[in-house]
A protein has these predicted regions:
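Conserved PLP-binding catalytic core of the aspartate aminotransferase-like
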Residues: 270, 282-314, 330
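N-terminal "arm"/small-domain region of PLP-dependent enzymes with the aminotransferase-like
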Residues: 1-56, 143-144
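Active-site phosphate-binding strand-loop segment of PLP-dependent enzymes
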Residues: 126, 130-186
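PLP-dependent enzyme catalytic core of the Aspartate aminotransferase-like
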Residues: 164, 309-314, 319, 323-353
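Phosphate-binding glycine-rich loop
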Residues: 63-103, 121, 301
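PLP-dependent aspartate aminotransferase-fold enzymes
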Residues: 79, 91-133, 139
Length: 353
């Protein structure tokens, strides 16, 4: 770091993203991207005519996308705010609803950016341990007196709470915002969007990166009552008014409209997840009951970090977290059937099955 860095940032530990190799030699099962390309409707929407309009700023109100999203989710446009990836939605929410005297509560094993953002913005953390089996006890979050963020389904475990459990947390914290990060909800979770009109303290965040094949476009949505969304827009228009580029606005709108492609690709991933889990368990792995587009697995036959390295040597990238309680586990993105068969073949060679 330079001698000019603010003292407030010197102890911040940045987030470590998954590896993004710039060549094609790896089977990439490490960052929970979709193995399928964007919808053909997206390719049509991002036309030459739209590219030529890149000389112009994008619509800061994101009106066309909001109208499409409102119709899709059964909400009003004023109940939705697009973000430059759901990370921006989440960051804006923490900026709006937390500060040095208003902490953020989250699980000890969950999406790593929550803790990073707390460090960046000097927000106190209330870290709530998951149970020994990595499940979350909703009653641990009752009456906390803090803003709460829940990844549901959780990452990296893939486990999910039913909507009724989230509703219990909402009822037990009427004076605090409860943020539900639904990045993986389309693969088997139960969305809390239907609860938005019932709970003024509920903010739901979703992404286009997983089930809608737009990780590289960076688009997310925050959804809640109109006053919460107005709070987020206060942050947005104080920081980054043109936060969604023109091509992403068009791509996101087209992705929402092509429900048939969404259903087909989602079903394919869920089916592949099912038989991959069975194959891993047949090889002696412990595999959690994922409701996401990845599996969280471990084996007593080899340390998680060592297995990650051996797989990488064989051209297969998975995610290993060198962290308490989960160091022996791997997070494995669900790819195409051929990619998962290649993973299993590599594991057989490493473990000498």
């Amino acid at each position: 770091m330079s001698r000019f860095l603010s003292e407030r940032l010197m102890n911040v530990t940045p987030y470590t993203p998954g590896e993004q190799p710039q060549d094609q030699k790896y089977i990439k099962l490490n960052t929970n991207e979709s193995p399928y390309p964007p919808s053909p409707a997206v390719l049509d929407a991002v036309s030459r005519a739209e590219v030529e309009k890149l000389r112009l700023y994008s619509d800061p109100a994101c009106a066309e996308l909001l109208n499409t999203a409102a119709k899709h989710f059964g909400l009003k446009p004023s109940q939705i705010m697009p973000g430059n990836g759901s990370d921006e939605n989440l960051f804006f929410a923490l900026r709006a609803f937390c500060d040095e005297e208003h902490p953020l509560a989250y699980a000890d094993i969950t999406y790593g950016c929550y803790g990073v953002w707390c460090g960046l913005m000097h927000i106190p953390s209330r870290i709530i341990p998951l149970k020994a089996d990595f499940t979350l006890d909703p009653t641990d979050y009752y009456g906390l007196g803090a803003t709460i963020v829940l990844a549901n389904p959780n990452a990296p475990t893939g486990l999910a709470l039913p909507r009724s459990a989230i509703e219990g947390i909402l009822k037990a914290n009427p004076d605090n915002v409860v943020i539900v990060d639904e990045a993986y909800v389309d693969f088997g979770g139960e969305s809390c969007v239907p609860l938005i009109d019932q709970y003024e303290n509920l903010l739901v965040v979703q992404t286009f990166s997983k089930s809608r094949q737009l990780a590289g476009a960076r688009l997310g949505l925050a959804m809640g009552n109109e006053k919460l969304i107005a709070d987020l827009n206060r942050v947005k228009f104080s920081l980054n008014p043109y936060n969604i580029n023109r091509l992403t606005l068009k791509a996101g709108q087209a992705a929402l409209e092509d429900t048939a492609y969404f259903d087909t690709t989602r079903a394919a991933i869920v089916e592949t997840r099912g038989w991959t889990k069975q194959e891993l368990e047949a090889r002696g792995f412990s595999v959690l009951d994922s409701r996401s587009n990845f599996l969280f697995a471990s084996t007593v036959r080899k340390d998680g970090g060592e297995l990650y390295k051996k797989l990488k040597e064989k051209g297969v990238l998975v995610r290993h977290f060198d962290a308490p309680r989960i160091g022996s586990w791997l997070r494995i993105t669900i790819g195409t059937p051929d990619e998962m068969r290649a993973l299993l073949k590599a594991l057989d060679e490493i473990l000498e099955v």
